[in-house]
Curated annotation (Swiss-Prot):
Residues 1211-1221 have a biased composition (Polar residues). Residues 348-357 have a biased composition (Basic and acidic residues). The gene is ATI. Pfam families: Pox_A_type_inc. InterPro entries: Pox_A_type_inc. This is A-type inclusion protein A25 homolog.
Amino acid sequence: MEVTNLIEKCTKHSKDFATEVEKLWNDELSSESGLSRKTRNVIRNILRDITKSLTTDKKSKCFRILERSTINGEQIKDVYKTIFNNGVDVESRINTTGKYVLFTVMTYAAAELRLIKSDEIFALLSRFFNMICDIHRKYGCGNMFVGIPAALINLLEIDQINKLFSVFSTRYDAKTFIYTEYFLFLNINHYLLVSGSELFINVAYGPASFSSPISVPDYIMEALTFKACDHIMKSGDLKYTYAFTKKVKDLFNTKSDSVYQYVRLHEMSYDGVSEDTDDDDEVFAILNLSIDSSVDRYRNRVLLLTPEVASLRKEYSDVEPDYKYLMDEEVPAYDKHLPKPITNTGIEEPHATGGDKEEQEQQPVKVVQSKPDDGITPYNPFEDPDYVPTITKTVLGIADYQLVINKLIEWLDKCEEECGNGGEYKTELEEAKRKLTELNLELSDKLSKIRTLERDSVYKTERIDRLTKEIKELRDIQNGTDDGSDSSEIDKKTIRELRESLDREREMRTELERELDTIRDGKVEGSCQRELELSRMWLKQRDDDLRAEIDKRRNVEWELSRLRRDIKECDKYKEDLDKAKTTISNYVSRISTLESEIAKYQQDRDTLSVVRRELEEERRRVRDLESRLDECTRNQEDTQEVDALRSRIRELENKLADCMESGGGNLTEISRLQSKISDLERQLRECRGNATEISRLQYRITDLERQLNDCRRNNENNADTEREMQRLRDRITDLERQLSDCRRNNESNADMEREMQRLRDRIMDLDRQLNECKRDGNGTSSEEVNRLKTRIRDLERSLEICSKDESELYSAYKSELGRAREQISNLQESLRRERESDKTDSYYRRELTRERNKIVELEKELNKCFDTNHAKYIDEINSKKTRISDLERQLAACKSNGGSNGDMDQYKREIESLKRELAECRRGNNGSHSDCKYYDEEAREEVKRLRQELTQLHEDLKRARESDKNDSYYKRELERQRAKVIEVEKELERYFDDSRLAECKRHGDEMLRKIADLEKKLRDGGNGNGGNGCTSSCEFERKRIAVLEVEVRKSMETIKSLEKFMEFDRLQKDCADKLDREKERRMKAERDLEREIARKNCGGNPCERELESERSNVKRLEYQLDAEKEKVKFYKRELERDRYLSSRYLTSSSDPDEKPLPNYTFPRIEVEPLTTEDTEPKPVEVVPPSSDVTEPISSGVTPSVDAEPEHPQLSEYQTSVSQVAVTPPPKPETPQISEYQDYSELYSASNNTESKNVFSELAYLDDLDKLDDIDEYLLNNIMPEKTV
């Protein structure tokens, strides 16, 4: 069901998503887990809805619809929160396929909706992909994959994409194969676009867009959420570009290959090549054959189209070339502006029709349009499993030949590159290439001519129909009316014109038949007629489409020209934009630096401006305070008041004297006056406290000056700051000056206070005198008392005024102090911010250094990874060389078969004979097809039987491969050890050959002869001299014989080892030759099969061709199965032989009960030292005796040994199993053995020096399975042998 509204679409897709997740909710994750095509399409549909909603006002609504969908009765939002659990132990919670899909889709949807900055998206995806790696590592689900939507990819830079890629590439334990391939494709695509490739294909919908110059697999398109209904635009130079739109059917079963529909992209722009539906089999992939195959690694059909079962997906390193695109079906591009094509047609089936062949050929095809009221179900050929598609007249076959020619030209180019300038096949390759080019040009010309003729045929056919209708109408008129000669003349003229038109049409038809016969490369009876009938069948279906296409092209030509001009201008603008982007990026970096500096200076300037404003306010307030202080001072310094007080005091004194004289007074009034005087004194003391506050303010100003000096030192490089500091300095000078004025005012206040103190003292004296007067009984007159009260009130008023001025001055100084404190706090805050900014800058510098070091380490890791993959590249090069040699052999076979067309003529004669027999059979059966139908059914039964056999062979092959997995370790081990053995053989060839082997045998024979001679002499000496005098000599000779026997055994073991290596080399070469023969036989069978298929495709019954193809497939699979079985048997035989040789060698060469023989010196035997590859458990060493032995054994025998044996000269290659035997060094001074030196002394001496002279030998076959690197084993276990 097709939905047009976005909200309705989102609702439907959310329900489908919830249903699919419920189905997969209990499927546990494992190595076989994977998403089907239906599940991938459901995920793509819901993510597309979220992406489309980003450009509308419904984005939050679409996301809420998804969140509110229910899974198992619970909303998706709650289920997601339960699974995520704040990122704690996510890998343990996501243990099923349904939970995996829900977790990834909700994460991507939330990221698309809420994140717009690339840094935020990168941080989220880094954490998310680490969780994905943990899940894959725990469950081994390497085939699970839900890629990043294009809406998020477009917001990321390439550096961020590479960092996300490193999350997967560094997690070696996590099996994230498809994620790695996804990011590898993004990297390859980006660097091809950056390199300036003008050939590209662009796909876009809504805010998402993606461009690629190479083929794009379907799983990449699904991950980027693109569909075949999106807008597609391609470069004009891309001629062979195809878009796959749908999976039609599966071959045999779902595990085999499938047949897909594709659309060839002829135009530069499409609004979609298929209809926007929710089909479960919908596919979208881009195949680009116009680019070099060495760049496009996804051209291979196995990589381009993902199989239905995800576990059958193969990686790039495992696939073989597969370009079976001929089996897919081409369909026309969908155009939403045109009417839908007729899909339900009633066509008579070929096996159910009757009548003669001629009647069938002349009978037109009946096309019945389906009506909604019809009760009959229309025939759908795609639902019929026995349906055989009829060959229609299209350019598909020629286009396929065009693809084959392009592929052959590409292969020939590679062969020419491999052959070089002096290759013997160069001339043949050039000739073949020239012929292919000519054939390509001829096909192109014929193809263009056929298209022209087809268009003309359509036009002429329409005209014939139109004229036929007119003729019929004219005949009806002529038969119905007999009056008027003018009308008959007109009719005759019209009929004449129509006959001329018919003649021209016949000539055009004849020319078309000739062209078709020419293309068929021969005159075939009735082929042109049949081709025309088939072309009519096809043209009838596409009649309306072609008419609309012609009209559309006429109307769009000017639009295309305008678009081309716009594209050129856009390219020019793009170049200018790239240049502007680089310039802008440089300017942005510079601007960011300047902005940081400006911000810093702006902060300082703002702080200084605030300080300046505050200082201006302080200056104004200080002026006000100064004016008030001056007034107060003037008031306090008013001498008139002081004189008045003095005169008043004198008057009081006089009156006091009068009172004393008069002897009377008012004691109550005097006491009240005394209390009033004490209050005045208290107020004077409070005024005195202002001086201490002024001194404290002076100290605060000094502290502010010190802090301003510190700020000046921190900003000494800033000229503006210095000027501002200078102004502050001047202001501080003014403040100091004002402070000095205040101090002078305070000094004047101190004088006033001293004067008042003196007056208080005077008043106290007066009070004392008054009290004395009271005691004397004197009184005062009421008049004088009133005057004193009035004066006291005046003094109180003056004191209040002075106190008020002092309080105002105190409040002003207090406010100034608060502002100064606030200024200090602001300066401290600015200083703290500057220090924090310095710390932040240093932190960023450290982070930058750390990131640079990390980049260097990653580059080292990349180089290391390239070094480790060098062997893989070499193997790939060797496989390419093998493929080139196969192609050369195939080319030689083609040349040998190309000289004569006998086979082709024979095939054509056979086809003609089969056709004649078929016609006679049909005529003999009176038009009935019973026999044909019988044989057709028999052929179908045979096909079904062969399919069952093929399925059984597939299962056998699968079981064989599963059984082979058990031996995969041994196979890899054997292959690795083979490589090592080859290296060892190369080293052995430098030191050992047939002559050296013969020399070793000769030395062994000489030593045996010498041993026999010594035994004979010993027996002769024992029989002739049977006394104690020869006991020591006999013992010495026996020990010498024992040592020689040890040397002989070692020499024989060396010879046996060499013989084993030679036998292994022979077997290895035989097996390699056998494998090569098997490969050649298999490739020859494949080539024969391809030629047979090509021969059958030239003509014949479709059932016969299908039967032959099935038989060839069965044979090919049998060959593959036999080859796989032979490989398994060969690996098992080699492994058993290797183990048998190693076990036999160990049991034969080592005796656990054998004790090591003591080493004694013996006379020098001129024999070159021998080396061995086999290892004994306890090797016997010949050790020189101690140097203090001087007496000989007998006068006639003087044994000589090497005092310090030298090591043999080893090759520079340390991986060889054996050493080179060298010529012994010249004899040193001969030490002598004392006759009193007994056996124990010699044995102890040998044991003391044994640790220095013992060398270890190689136990090759025993330890071969335990080591991964034989070079390391040889370096650690082989020590040079000392020469005896």
